[in-house]
């Protein structure tokens, strides 16, 4: 299903391919070449500020710092908590942040100058697969809207303005939301209103009735269930199994000036990713750490169920999902494939 675009965008096939090349499919060999040409592996910048949003999938950045993997590679990672994706974007562009845990599609949006400043960007690595969800309010669920088909029937029967929230206009959450609504026969621009809300504010906004549904990363989907205000209509891994989600993003200028630093940070985060996925105990330790006020600031119970693949939908259904959030998965997670970038760009074009 491909509803008409609500507005036009001038993006040729050549521009799509050029933008997709932001990914490390092209960057990794170039980075390696620059490192060897420099004659030393010593990081140019010993301290690196990495922005993150309070979401479970910031964990590999946080744990690389907490467990000291960064020191092993000669850098100090300073995780920097940010309030919104727009703030992350602006601080990356200005140089206030060196790198960031960031939405896949946000990097491409900035590279193309869509809905904000334009700057050449780089995707260093993928940070995680899976682990996001679309939540519908308990009010809608009580009226029978518990999945896409029943939501479409309710919206057709009970006509009013329905509001749904994503976290950033070109981000992954917006793309999952638009795709799912359209697949259910709902045009996200003609049949509904879509707003932008920062991830940590989703649950509070649903509680006061500001939206009928939202798409966001964990732990906020599970938090809505725990608080009795929402139900999980679909997980994003049910939309696209093992989909890419967050990346380690930076500017092209930073890579050119600090190739060894980039490599060191990537190695530290890759080691943290491997550590998280290595055991049940490691996942639980990670959940305890990122739940702290300095990071996500929520109860550990909001994190430690879905990170283990233990899901419930808020309506009595429970299941074990083998395709829960993963950070390494035997190395399958972390390479940023060109085809992944192309998918997000085609969705940007589709939705204007």
Name what the model sees in each region.
Residues 134-135, 247-250, 254-255:
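Short glycine- and hydrophobic/aromatic-rich loop-to-beta-strand nucleating segment
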Residues 199-200:
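Functional cores that coordinate and move charged inorganic groups
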Residues 257-352:
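Secondary-structure end/capping motifs
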Residues 1-15, 29:
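N-terminal secretory signal peptides
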Residues 15-37:
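N-terminal export signals
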Residues 38-196, 208-225, 229-242:
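Short, glycine-/small- and polar/acidic-enriched structural segments
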Residues 242-243, 285:
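Short gly/pro-enriched beta-turn/loop segments at secondary-structure junctions
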